[in-house]
Amino acid sequence: MNVCVMGLGNIGLPVVQHVSKVYRQTQGYDISLEAVNAVKKKGIDASTELACADIYVIAVNTWHRNGYSDMSAIEDCTKQALKLNPDALICFESTLAKGTARKLAEKYNSSNMAVCPHRWWKQEEDKYGVIQLRVLGALNQESQKKALDFYNTLGIPIHVVSSLEIAELSKLVENTYYYLRIAYAEDLKLLCEDNRVSFEELREAVNTKWNVDMAEARDGIGGECLPKDIQILIDTYPNMPLLHGAISTDKNYRAKIAHNPFGSKPETQQIEENNNSNNKSHGT
């Protein structure tokens, strides 16, 4: 069984490292020679030229640019892979806009596709690495069986959902949920500051309840995933005022802390995942 991991950046690098430990015939692919050389230094086959494979794991970055979800890299990888092997299983681990996988299956006449969004946290890779519970949705029963066999062989536990779309949405919704939690904390922190109330003491107090886990409010919601994913979800469902409000809250919070009102350090520390012990995230 030949496996090719397409995209060797933040998503693909840990994936290709893990896959290569299980499948001897594993190759990493990236258009960046620097990324390819980094993988080669780890003793893993990698190239800027795509090879034929039985399974392609697509792990390239997706973007939200100029007000639109940009899935062009996903489509390019899919097109290249199916050109080399029309019967290959395509496993999308990248974050996708709802409907992306099905549209590509129809456009390129593929009957073997699955969506299994990655979950990985760089800050605690030993605990929250590649091997953790994943959501998987497939195009059909045959694709589901092939994908389950693949991930079971990798030792990755799977929660199966009924469709590609549910799997796509699950990634967007979980990251948006985390965005909302941080935005609420940011808004509350500003309110506390205006009313001379200790936000940290209040947060510590409310987090003593078993079903409350209030996020930290630090230096704004940054990183590669959270700001992008909430925008992609809004593209799908634009009539969600709560999401628009959260983005506005974070923008307002950033503007306020730019003048250092909380006595924080002048350098900005962006938040993608919160590493507070009371507020664990499973990464992107």
Task: Give, region by region, the residue ranges found by the protein language model.
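Internal alpha-helical scaffold of NAD(P)-dependent oxidoreductase catalytic cores
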Residues: 105-114, 121-122, 126-212, 236-239
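Electropositive phosphate-/nucleotide-binding environments in soluble metabolic enzymes
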Residues: 29, 68-75, 98, 141, ...
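Rossmann-like NAD(P)(H) cofactor-binding subdomain of soluble oxidoreductases
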Residues: 52-55, 63-124
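NAD(P)-dependent Rossmann-like dehydrogenase/reductase catalytic/cofactor-binding core
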Residues: 2, 52, 145, 193-284
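NAD(P)+-binding Rossmann beta1-loop-alpha1 motif at the extreme N-terminus of oxidoreductases
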Residues: 1-51, 270-279
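Alpha-helix C-terminal capping/helix-to-coil transition sites in glycosyltransferase folds
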Residues: 51-52, 131
